[in-house]
């Protein structure tokens, strides 16, 4: 290795991605040790890191071109040793001259003083704070003022951050393109509207409240299904650069709040609405009219009470077929659809606002490549028959779709481009239906999770890439419920 040209060695090092392999290789020779150290751009440290100032300075000298640092103390207990504190963070910020991306996770000994050190890090572009219990709005404001290049900010489970002066400053003088706020109980969704002109630059935005799937349920609250939050320009801001929007676990009544964003996104490509309360058809209709570029939509819906007439009230999910018709008419680039329904009983199909007719209008109007249906009680074998003629469908995931049987499997087996199929808790599908998939010889990947009437032997006969499990926890853990 000593005789190889440095340029060739550098290329070899670039192709090695595992940190353990890089560490081993650096011990082979002094040349490799130096070159690997100079080339390493990212490190992830946590429990076991020596927090002495001298050791941290030595680490920074070993890797002089670090641009990405992740400090993660998840699972930390006192016997693991000391955590990095404000003084240690100052060493990183002052000795890593190329630092642009910093993540602090479960750092219990870093507070506002530590964040003030980052204010001198003029190259910082991305900052992620996860479970930072001692950081408040004061420290965040110092970062907003000092880090003039900051374009991405993630705040997750930061319970002491409340005042939004930092947000107002970033909206007025900052350059944020990505903002993610989750589980920060001091920040309400309507506070985010104080971002003002900053919405113009934002390309990705996520806000998730503190409630779980049922955390916002209020059985005595009835929402107006005819209310139109977009008929008047209540908030004077634009978000024409926004491409990725996620709203989860928030109640948009009586405060309209972030609901207003839905009618202002002209460049939106990806939308995720997960257990947002009080929305109705008018919200998706307004969005569809301005978002002709929409390519992916995820709607996770639970039961709510709606009424447009004081004499009548119904319990159902937020949207009806009118929303599907609007999407079908205006969003002709839609490729990914994820529909999940929570708390809806199979013997009460009216609890879901969508019908199979409306759903198929959407599917047949757009080039859908990926389709996920969870507890879609309106969907049956006739729906599978219609789906089988979808010319672009490549990936299909069905979970707890009780009306889908072996007949549906026979239909879907002949879908022109279908290469990946996932069945979870679909108890009306048996070995007979799975055999139909094997006869078609089209699938490249098959996942069977907790389908009680499907055997491992039948699944293995379909294709080479098969995942099979009878463990019910596997079925739930792999469908994203951890994000609820």
Residue ranges, per PLM feature:
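CRL adaptor-proximal regions
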Residues: 1-3, 211, 303, 343, ...
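N-terminal adaptor-interaction module of cullin-RING ubiquitin ligase components
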Residues: 1-225, 231-249, 259-262, 270, ...
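Leucine-rich repeat
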Residues: 63, 77, 96, 110-111, 121-122, 135-136, 146-147, 161, ...
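Right-handed parallel beta-helix
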Residues: 89-90, 253, 360
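Eukaryotic tandem repeat interaction scaffolds
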Residues: 212, 273-276, 289-428
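C-terminal interaction modules of eukaryotic adaptor/scaffold proteins
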Residues: 416, 421-428, 432-484
């Amino acid at each position: 290795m000593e005789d190889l040209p440095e340029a060739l060695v550098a290329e070899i090092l670039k192709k090695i991605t595992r940190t353990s392999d890089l560490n081993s290789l650096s011990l082979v020779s002094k040349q490799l040790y130096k070159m690997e150290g100079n080339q390493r751009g990212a490190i992830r440290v946590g429990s076991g890191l020596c927090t002495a100032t001298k050791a941290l300075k030595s680490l920074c000298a070993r890797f002089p071109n670090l641009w990405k640092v992740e400090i993660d103390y998840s699972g930390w207990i006192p016997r693991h040793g000391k955590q990095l504190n404000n003084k240690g963070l100052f060493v990183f910020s002052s000795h890593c001259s190329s630092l642009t991306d910093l993540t602090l996770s479960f750092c219990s000994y870093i507070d506002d003083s530590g964040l003030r050190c980052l204010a001198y890090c003029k190259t910082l572009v991305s900052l992620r704070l996860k479970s930072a219990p001692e950081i408040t709005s004061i420290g965040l404001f110092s970062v907003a003022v000092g880090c003039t290049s900051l374009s991405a900010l993630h705040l997750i489970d930061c319970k002491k951050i409340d005042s939004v002066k930092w947000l107002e400053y970033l909206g007025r003088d900052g350059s944020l393109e990505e903002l993610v706020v989750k589980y920060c109980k001091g920040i309400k969704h309507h506070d985010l509207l104080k971002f003002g002109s900053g919405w113009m630059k934002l390309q990705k935005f996520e806000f998730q409240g503190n409630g779980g799937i049922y955390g916002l349920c209020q059985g005595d609250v009835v929402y107006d299904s005819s209310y139109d939050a977009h008929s008047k320009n209540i908030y004077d801001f634009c978000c024409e650069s926004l491409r990725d929007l996620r709203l989860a676990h928030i109640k948009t009544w009586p405060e309209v709040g972030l609901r207003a964003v839905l009618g202002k996104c002209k460049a939106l490509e990806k939308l995720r609405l997960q257990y947002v309360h009080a929305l109705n058809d008018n919200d998706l209709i307004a969005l569809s009219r301005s978002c002709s570029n929409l390519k992916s939509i995820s709607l996770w819906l639970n039961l709510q009470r709606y009424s447009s007439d004081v004499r009548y009230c119904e319990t159902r999910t937020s949207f009806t077929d009118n929303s599907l018709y609007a999407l079908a008419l205006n969003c002709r680039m839609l490729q990914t659809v994820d529909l999940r329904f929570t708390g809806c009983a199979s013997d009460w199909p009216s609890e879901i606002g969508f019908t199979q007719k409306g759903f198929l209008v959407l599917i047949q109007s757009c080039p859908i490549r990926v389709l996920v249906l969870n507890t879609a009680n309106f969907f049956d074998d006739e729906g599978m028959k219609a789906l089988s003629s979808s010319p672009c469908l490549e990936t299909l995931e069905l979970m707890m779709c009780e009306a889908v049987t072996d007949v549906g499997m026979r239909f879907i087996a002949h879908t022109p481009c279908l290469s990946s199929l996932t069945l979870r808790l679909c108890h009306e599908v048996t070995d007979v239906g799975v055999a139909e998939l094997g006869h078609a010889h089209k699938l490249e990947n098959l996942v069977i999770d907790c389908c009680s009437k499907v055997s491992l032997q039948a699944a293995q006969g379909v294709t080479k890439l098969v995942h099979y499990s009878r463990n019910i926890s596997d079925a739930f853990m792999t469908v994203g419920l951890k994000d609820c």
